[in-house]
Amino acid sequence: DTSKAPLNQQAPEFLSNSKVQQIKYLSTLSAATDQEIIDGLNKFIEAYGHWISIKKASVEENDFKENEKEVAFNELTKCSADYERLKHNLETYLIVGSDNLKKFRLMNTSMFIQMWHGKYAGKDEIKQKMDDASFNGFNADFYKSCNDDIFQTGISSGWRAFQLAFILLNLDGILDDTPDNLNRNELVDLVWFPTGGGKTEAYLGLISLTILHRRMQHKERGGGTAAIMRYTLRLLTLQQFQRASK
């Protein structure tokens, strides 16, 4: 039972054989090729499409009242629209060898590093590594050698399905900053889960991607404020700021 575990210590809800939900696998720290990443993300999205089909069949087969069926099909129509958005964003923005795919993988790198340090900062494990004669700083080779079962032995740290989907849904909103992107400007994606569901990691991933995009796309003009975080409670604002600044 992980329901009482801290947010970033809950095991991700993996889909069946979904290696592409593993954060380190998606990052620049893994040996996975761009094509393998794209293929995995395609399978991830198609799993959502398959789920929608199953739900539609379930509604049709069950003895629901007409008004109940209408509500169900309306919601599934919205799901289908998001499924099409996911496919469009992947095909349009995450192209093999593109800068956008590099930004996406670097975002996963930053999330993995943040999680690793969040777990081991001040602990004996990290002190032992720093005292080791072979320690050469916190560079790419160091993080490549780190195990990714950070919070639970044997389970790779990864995105929950809704977190990865939320990031993919917003690729166009971040990577396409042309002012005439009117269709996208009409959409606002809201992620809602009870406390401990993983909302923070989902939008921290987007913030990281936004920062990387601005700096890589606009160089020195890409500095400055990239995201504004505001909460209704002052203590919550402080807590979330501490988490975001790790």
Q: Each predicted region: which residue ranges?
A:
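N-terminal helicase ATP-binding lobe
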Residues: 1-246
